[in-house]
């Protein structure tokens, strides 16, 4: 009797403590005539994640409640109050859970979840100002004036865009946003199936527009998906405008989400058939004019973009941009 009485007192104390903390208490069962229902409210802890130790379990009783009805209702029942479990991005089936988990990590902690170990940090990517030292193209009449500040915000990089550790990489997507060939397929495979799951909720994308998702297993924190025009042969004025809109829409999302660095692939120049040289002219004009328009805001600390990277994969495209960049971002 003494032991039973003592256990009852301990149980009552633990229940009272749980009530003071706003944690859910174990349901003792219905009173006579009551239906077997209970409120889903959880007091001050109602907003906590399902993986928080004080959140409800699938059975409707939180860790606090589970502690209170432990095998012997002793002080050791506090043990369940532990750190939330780490999300495994390779097996998780909940993109919302994974996205929330990644947002709570530091840059160093995110590295553990990258799909690759040979990722490229932003500081390892030279600016156009540095790259231009090895460019022998002479431009007598550049299209724009020399601007040292803007030359430090542009980079030309040849390599795998999926391995760049930047705030966002841009995906040359199709209208479904569910993955395809070329760089689109590479990005989806590297990021993992959760990227496709989130894209499925975006319900397609129009040509020239852009939408943003988490980067998941990519070194990039976000993926900006944009749909370029299909242009086989000489592009029309409307197709050129749509390609320009791809870059400007992506840059708008960059500002909206307060991101500081982004890498762009060659949009529409693959299976979409846009001529590489013509595309480069559209791209460089759009980037130069956008940077100039936002330059004053940057100086007022209203907008800070550290780097815009033109990421090419083919030697052909690298040569085109090396030849055209001095016309839009002169260094001499």
Please place each PLM-identified region on the residue numbering.
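Phosphate/ribose-phosphate-bearing ligand recognition and processing surfaces
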Residues: 2-29, 33-64, 68-80, 84-86, ...
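N-terminal short beta-loop-beta anion/metal-coordinating cradle
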Residues: 133, 197-221
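Conserved, mostly hydrophobic/aromatic
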Residues: 170, 187, 224, 264, ...
């Amino acid at each position: 009797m003494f032991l039973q009485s003592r256990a009852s007192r301990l149980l009552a104390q633990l229940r009272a403590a749980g009530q003071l903390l706003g944690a859910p208490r174990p349901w003792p069962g219905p009173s006579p005539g009551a239906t077997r229902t209970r409120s889903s409210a959880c007091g001050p802890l109602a907003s906590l994640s399902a993986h928080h130790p004080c959140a409800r379990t699938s059975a409707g009783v939180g860790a606090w409640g589970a502690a209170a009805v432990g095998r012997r209702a002793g002080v050791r029942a506090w043990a369940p109050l532990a750190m939330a479990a780490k999300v495994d991005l390779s097996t998780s089936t909940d993109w919302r859970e994974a996205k929330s988990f990644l947002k709570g990590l530091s840059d160093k902690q995110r590295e553990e979840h990258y799909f690759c170990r040979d990722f490229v940090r932003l500081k390892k990517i030279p600016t156009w100002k540095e790259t231009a030292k090895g460019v022998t193209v002479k431009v007598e009449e550049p299209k724009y004036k020399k601007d040292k500040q803007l030359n430090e915000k542009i980079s030309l990089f040849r390599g795998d865009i999926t391995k760049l550790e930047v705030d966002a990489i841009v995906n040359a997507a199709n209208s479904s946003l569910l993955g395809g060939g070329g760089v689109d397929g590479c990005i989806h495979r590297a990021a993992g199936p959760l990227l496709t799951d989130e894209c499925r909720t975006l319900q397609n994308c129009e040509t020239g527009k852009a939408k943003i998702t988490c980067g998941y297993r990519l070194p990039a924190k976000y993926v900006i998906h944009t749909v370029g025009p299909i242009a086989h042969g000489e592009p029309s004025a409307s197709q050129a405008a749509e390609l320009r809109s791809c870059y400007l829409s992506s840059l708008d999302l960059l500002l909206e989400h307060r991101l500081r660095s982004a890498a762009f692939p060659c949009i529409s120049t693959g299976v979409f058939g846009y001529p590489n040289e013509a595309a480069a002219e559209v791209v460089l004009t759009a980037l130069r004019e956008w940077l100039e328009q936002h330059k004053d805001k940057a100086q007022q600390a209203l907008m800070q973009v550290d780097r815009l990277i033109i990421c090419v994969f083919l030697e052909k495209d690298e040569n085109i941009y090396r030849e055209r960049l001095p016309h839009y971002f002169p260094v001499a």
